[in-house]
From Swiss-Prot:
The keyword ATP-binding applies. Has 3 domains, the large (RuvB-L) and small ATPase (RuvB-S) domains and the C-terminal head (RuvB-H) domain. The head domain binds DNA, while the ATPase domains jointly bind ATP, ADP or are empty depending on the state of the subunit in the translocation cycle. During a single DNA translocation step the structure of each domain remains the same, but their relative positions change. Homohexamer. Forms an RuvA(8)-RuvB(12)-Holliday junction (HJ) complex. HJ DNA is sandwiched between 2 RuvA tetramers; dsDNA enters through RuvA and exits via RuvB. An RuvB hexamer assembles on each DNA strand where it exits the tetramer. Each RuvB hexamer is contacted by two RuvA subunits (via domain III) on 2 adjacent RuvB subunits; this complex drives branch migration. In the full resolvosome a probable DNA-RuvA(4)-RuvB(12)-RuvC(2) complex forms which resolves the HJ. It holds the Pfam family RuvB_C. Signal peptide: none annotated. This is Holliday junction branch migration complex subunit RuvB. Keywords: ATP-binding, Cytoplasm, DNA damage, DNA recombination, DNA repair, DNA-binding, Hydrolase, Nucleotide-binding. The RuvA-RuvB-RuvC complex processes Holliday junction (HJ) DNA during genetic recombination and DNA repair, while the RuvA-RuvB complex plays an important role in the rescue of blocked DNA replication forks via replication fork reversal (RFR). RuvA specifically binds to HJ cruciform DNA, conferring on it an open structure. The RuvB hexamer acts as an ATP-dependent pump, pulling dsDNA into and through the RuvAB complex. RuvB forms 2 homohexamers on either side of HJ DNA bound by 1 or 2 RuvA tetramers; 4 subunits per hexamer contact DNA at a time. Residues 4-184 are annotated as: Large ATPase domain (RuvB-L).
């Protein structure tokens, strides 16, 4: 089974949230990358402040580790309100959400992570709260039960999810602002690593930061995690300064190659090439070949490989690309390109 503590996993682990909080930007002016999102949010937040209104409810989605929680914190700071944080799986009962909402003050931001995992009962409570700033709750049981309405102060709900497709239409339609976070460029990640190093008091050369950024899979959380591990290596094996050579040696020791792939990524690609002739192969067969769950392949391993052009999904199954063969120095079959063309819909 997959190692839950993969160093290139975009999900937070252990004390990581606390460590990331120390280097997290607090205002849009400090926010690096995502230029379209930053520009739009500057306008939306500025307009809401001019009108002295709460910002429209905002849905933020994208792969893990790209800064959804960071954006929620920035929204709260820019709007001058407090941030109340929870997550979908924690809100089991309607009363859990009601308790949170009745403590909100005007201008506060309620951040619900993994909002796609809300129970239907809790989701129903959200609808009038989002639309009319009213809370409908039931008091009592059986024939004596009665419904009461509580007025809520104007607030902003920020929902975050890695799987926007699992949101119900009624919930999704109630968000006035929807933002998708994309993978970061190496240039933006280099700036993020440099900023984190300065805030953490880590001595680092520009080339060292760029080497870390190149292998961070377009994800700030991974970049900051790699920075901490390379810092450890530099202090023990070097003079404490992160150079390109130190970063390269440290990341090679951590089994993170120049594309940011770890042993699990390489294992999947090699199985596809060596056991299935490059594909096409069904995801269930591929999962069995590497002893992994289908969901792990689809949600954890595949997205970055597809985004980098090493794997494609076709109606007939998964296929390795020319990039995958080149990565391992394996000669691709001559029919590879035509086979991929034939597997694409409408071709």
């Amino acid at each position: 089974m997959i190692d839950q503590d993969r160093i290139v996993d975009g999900h937070a682990s252990g004390r990581e949230d606390q460590l990331d909080r120390a280097v997290r930007p607090k205002r849009l002016a400090e926010y690096i990358g995502q230029p379209a999102v930053r520009e739009q949010m500057e306008i939306f937040i500025g307009a809401a402040r001019l009108r002295e209104e709460a910002l429209d409810h905002t849905l933020v989605f994208g792969p893990p580790g790209l800064g959804k929680t960071t954006l929620a914190n920035i929204i709260a700071t820019e709007m001058g309100g407090d941030l109340k944080t929870t997550s979908g799986p924690v809100l089991d009962k309607a009363g859990d959400l009601a308790a949170l909402m009745t403590n909100l003050e005007a201008g506060d931001v309620l951040f619900i992570d993994e909002i796609h995992r809300l129970s239907p009962v809790v989701e129903e409570i959200l609808y009038p709260a989002m639309e009319d700033f009213q809370l409908d709750i039931m008091i009592g049981d059986g024939p004596a039960a009665r419904s009461i309405k509580l007025d809520l102060p104007p607030f902003t709900l920020v929902g975050a999810t890695t799987r926007a497709g699992l949101l119900t239409s009624p919930l999704r339609d109630r968000f006035g602002i929807v933002q998708r976070l994309e993978f970061y460029s190496v240039q933006d990640l280099t700036h993020i690593v440099k900023r984190s190093a300065q805030l953490s008091g880590v001595a680092m050369e520009e080339a060292g930061g760029m080497e870390i950024a190149r292998r961070a899979r377009g994800t700030p959380r991974i970049a900051n995690r790699l920075l901490r591990r390379v810092r450890d290596y530099a202090e023990v094996k070097g003079d404490g300064v992160i150079t390109a050579a130190i970063a390269d040696s440290a990341l090679n020791m951590l089994n993170v190659d120049h594309h940011g792939f770890d042993h699990m990524d390489r294992r999947l690609l090699l199985a596809l090439i060596e056991k299935f002739g490059g594909g096409p192969v069904g995801v269930d067969s591929l999962a069995a070949a590497i002893s992994e769950e289908r969901d792990t392949i689809e949600d954890v391993l595949e997205p970055y490989l597809i985004q980098q052009g090493f794997l494609v999904r076709t109606p007939r199954g998964r296929m390795a690309t020319q990039n995958a063969y080149n990565h391992f120095g394996i000669l691709a079959p001559k029919h590879l390109e035509s086979q991929q063309q034939d597997s694409l819909p409408g071709i």
